[in-house]
Amino acid sequence: IGVGYYNMYEKPQLGNPLTVYLFQGARIARFNQRLSLNYEWNFGASFGWKPYHSDLNPYNKVIGSKVNAYLNTNFYFNWMLSPKFDFTTGVAVTHFSNGNTKFPNAGLNSIGLKVGLVYNINRKEECFAKPLYQSPVPKFPRHISYDLVLFGSWRRKGVTIGEGQMVASPETYPVLGFNFAPMYNFGYKFRAGISLDGVYDGSANVYSPDGYGDELLKPSAGKQLALGVSGRAEYVMPYFTVGIGLGTNVIHAGGDLKSFYQILALKIEVTRNSFLHIGYNLQDFHDPNYLMLGFGFRFNNKYPTFHRR
């Protein structure tokens, strides 16, 4: 678990958020005994924002809530200076968002350089020596596994009225869905497949009967259901899996549900064959759709479990 502090240099409008997050990292490539290229990802929550308010904070057009999700990815070089100290430098990409649960939700993105000094509490002198023996890695049993995810969330909605004008919905709408994905496990770190994606989006095709936004009505449930197909790819790590998906709805009633969507998801292992699912659905790579918070089950799982020994 990590803790961070961000200075936004616009404290009256944005605040300076504090982050609390899970993190995981590993070596990508090793150039010699002291130098390596590594990655690290962070996922958690950020606190202390000053959200948009029409009277008190009208200039903040990007953040609408006091608590927001926090995503961060680092790629960096790591120099082992001594058994206790490392020097790191690289690039960090960060995203803050409330997952479309409040307006506004433009989100905030940043990219920057990373420089740090790491103190290793338990590392020993042997870290500089080349190991005399490395345990052989068993051949990976390639196979097809099946992931079933059930998720739900809530969202706000911008409704188009008049000549392209948008008004914010006065309420939040429920979202419920499932994913069923046969995944081919290529090796210890990668799996890919196709997913059948079903969703009920309570905000889909909401409309204003008078065209002025004074009243917003929901259509029949049939116009808020969709079934889609997406291609999936996942990077597998001990306890954590990061995945992406690209898909389109194939059965729907049109309108908001006629879309090309993208999915970014984190799966956190609970047992060998079950996991927590935290995902985000986008439309056309830039329009936020909804969070995907749920639970998943994996069937026909033949993945070796070294980290549980």
Regions inferred by a protein language model and the residue ranges of each:
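Solvent-exposed loop/turn segments connecting transmembrane beta-strands
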Residues: 9-17, 33, 100-103, 170-173, ...
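Flexible, solvent-exposed loop segments that connect beta-strands
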Residues: 52-62, 160-169, 203-221
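Transmembrane beta-barrel strands of outer-membrane/channel proteins
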Residues: 3-5, 39-47, 89-95, 144-156, ...
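Residues on the lipid-exposed face of transmembrane beta-strands in outer-membrane beta-barrel proteins
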Residues: 22-28, 41-45, 71-79, 91, ...
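Outer-membrane beta-barrel "beta-signal"
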Residues: 109-130, 288-309
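Flexible internal linker/loop segments at domain or repeat junctions
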Residues: 189, 193-230, 234, 239
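Repeated loop/turn-to-beta-strand initiation elements of outer-membrane beta-barrel proteins
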Residues: 79-87, 123-126, 188-192, 237-243, ...
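Residues that define the transmembrane beta-barrel architecture of outer-membrane proteins
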Residues: 14-20, 35, 65-71, 107-113, ...
